[in-house]
Structure formats: structure tokens, C-alpha cells
Amino acid sequence: KKALEKIKSILEKGGAEVIEVKDDRVNPSKEEILVLMYEFKIGLEKYLANSNSPYKTLKELIDYNEENKEKVLKHFDQSIFIESDKTSSKKSEYLRALDVVLDSRNQIDKLINENNVDALVGLSWSPAWEINHDGGDDEAIAKQRFWVNGGRAAMAGYPNVIVPLDLVDGLPIGMSFIGTAWEEKKLIQFAYAFEKINGFFPKPKM
């Protein structure tokens, strides 16, 4: 809450009118993951086909990892590889999911146009979480405060300019300026003005 209040205060200090935008739509994370898994296999195998690697398919990489698991799977499994390899038979599901994901463009456009705003702003990501070799990211994230913004912009292929905001729990967090297609120049101008007023440029502690 304090971070959001800081964003509002800086924006108003810079002459912006801040309008609260309500968006209660659920992020299509299930569809997003299916699209990611499906396209990951295609992209990886296209890369491997033109590389010097002796392995040309995702399945060959999975088999190699399994054969050498004591060395290469010491900390993490390869469940993402395995799930991605299963998507070859899911083209129709992929196409439906892709339609849902790409509809994020319409959702962002609608929020901007209906509320007559130049950009959508909000907190970007929560502080970085600790590496958990046993439980992975999910378990690590569960132990701390977590939020995320900008996923819909990523799915839409729309610009999302992130600038430093403040420290939370001793770790840096950022804020996002999200816009519609081809609005990069305007968003960068907003972000630059925000950074000048905020003046938050922490030096890392070694």
C-alpha cells in the first residue's frame, strides 16, 4: 500500500492526473503456459536443427538428462521439458489458448480507452525470492509477499517500461508503465520523468 501511495504521490507531483482503474478479470495463466510450452518445443528444435549440437529434438535432451541425472539434475527436475514435449498432439488446444492469450491486447486497449488514460501504472514484481533447491520457486515465493503486474502486457506483446521505485524488505522493487501498441516513446518519456522526481538509484551492497 505504501508503495502504491508513493507512485500516486510522484505522479501527481509531476502533474499527472491519477485515475483508479478497476480490472477484476482473471489472468489467463493456464492458457499462457500452454502457449509457452507448445512454442518452446518448436523454437528449441528449430534452434537445435541449425546448431552443432548432437541432440536435435527435445526428447533427445530429456533422455540425455535422464541418463546423466546425478550430474545435470542435481537440484531441479525437467518437468517443464517433459510437459513441453507432450504438446505436439495439442495443436487445437494450443490455437484456442493462443486466441485467449492474444485477447489481452483487446483487454488493455479497452482499459485505456474506457478510462481515457495515457498509460496503466502499477507495481511490477515483488522482491526477488531466495533460491530454494529443494522446493523450487513455488515454495520460495510462498514464504514472502508476492505480487506481479504486466503479465497481460507480455502476452499481448505490448510495451511495459519498468523503473526502480523503492526498497521492500531490503530489496528493490519496480513500477510499470503499460501502454498499447507502438506507445514506447510516450511510456519512456513518462518513465524518465518519474525517475527524475523519484531519484531512487540505490547502490548494491557487496
Model-derived regions: residue spans:
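Short, surface-exposed loop/helix-turn segments at secondary-structure junctions
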Residues: 95, 129-150
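Short glycine-rich anion-binding loops that position phosphate/pyrophosphate groups of nucleotides
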Residues: 50, 125-128
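Conserved acidic residues
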Residues: 116-118
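Structural helix-boundary/capping segments
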Residues: 5-13, 49, 154-206
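Gly/Ser-rich, acidic/histidine-flanked active-site/gating loops
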Residues: 1-53
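Short helix-loop capping/hinge segments that flank enzyme active sites or metal/cofactor-binding pockets
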Residues: 38-104, 162-172
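Stable alpha-helical elements in mature extracytoplasmic
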Residues: 3-7, 40, 93, 104, ...
